[in-house]
Amino acid sequence: MRVLGIETSCDETGIAVYDDKKGLLSHALYSQVKLHADYGGVVPELASRDHVRKIVPLIRQALADAGMTIEDIDGIAYTKGPGLIGALLVGACVGRALAFSWDKPAIGVHHMEGHLLAPMLEDDVPEFPFLALLVSGGHSMIVGVEGIGRYTVLGESVDDAAGEAFDKTAKLMGLDYPGGPRLSKLAAKGVPNSYRFPRPMTDKPGLNMSFSGLKTFAANTIAAEPKDEQTRANIACAFEEAVVDTLAIKCKRALKQTGYKNLVIAGGVSANTRLRSSLAEMMQGLGGKVYYPRGEFCTDNGAMIAYAGLQRLKAGQVEGLEVKGQPRWPLDTLEPVD
């Protein structure tokens, strides 16, 4: 089965073709980073308009790269939510229209399920069950995964997501958009343990997380300390250490609670080098293994949507004729794939 995947939940237009026998055949991606840089963040209306401009050319490109036409496609998967409603509707409208006009089945995919399953695009894949840490600009959650669609959200951020805290702290430091990767680059120049930031909610039972207070602590530290480059790097390093340690502590607690031996990390923040290194070291000590997608599949992309959609289409799950986007969509409400 060959599935065309369409991702338009935020500020990346991602298109891919995935074959259940041959794997990923093609993927094309357009990022709107330059468009939103002048505003210091994503402007929803501009994001929607840019998706409209880019989506059809990217579909043509992905099909051409795969050596196919739409007639060779067996199904279409598009991101249904969560995300920006205008952006979601662009992908949903195009995906549903193509499916209707070419008489193909279509499925709306949960964006975070796409991230969760992104490591399945690699050669070395995790076996169910496993623990998943999903960390991005909009979400931070720890999920018990028994199978596709069999998810239990064990813990999540009660305020800012980890990626959001990275971006906001970067902005406080005067770093350009996108701030998270720039803050991490600055942190690499810092001296570890120069400052001690709190590890929020790690002294309390449970698996929920909080990062808004950490952002406030960073703001106060930035205001009180010298503004030279090394001090800025040390502060960035301390902030990153605190976020990574908090995530690692919560994951270790969840692994002990569930008895799972393998950990998946996915979402934009999963590309963070310090986070990967810390969790790999932790899992080695626990006798388990950590899995994550390659860098280009950590951020939003069509490949993960094509893969996730294929699993559901093969199970006979299809959308009706309605075009619908879900800005909010709890992950643990998804229908299981038997």
UniProtKB/Swiss-Prot annotation:
Keywords: Acyltransferase, Cytoplasm, Iron, Metal-binding, Transferase, tRNA processing. It is found in: Cytoplasm. InterPro entries: ATPase_NBD, Gcp-like_dom, KAE1/TsaD, Peptidase_M22_CS, TsaD. GO terms for biological process: tRNA threonylcarbamoyladenosine modification. It catalyses: L-threonylcarbamoyladenylate + adenosine(37) in tRNA = N(6)-L-threonylcarbamoyladenosine(37) in tRNA + AMP + H(+). GO terms for molecular function: iron ion binding; N(6)-L-threonylcarbamoyladenine synthase activity. HAMAP family: TsaD (MF_01445). Required for the formation of a threonylcarbamoyl group on adenosine at position 37 (t(6)A37) in tRNAs that read codons beginning with adenine. Is involved in the transfer of the threonylcarbamoyl moiety of threonylcarbamoyl-AMP (TC-AMP) to the N6 group of A37, together with TsaE and TsaB. TsaD likely plays a direct catalytic role in this reaction. This is tRNA N6-adenosine threonylcarbamoyltransferase. It comes from Shewanella pealeana (strain ATCC 700345 / ANG-SQ1).
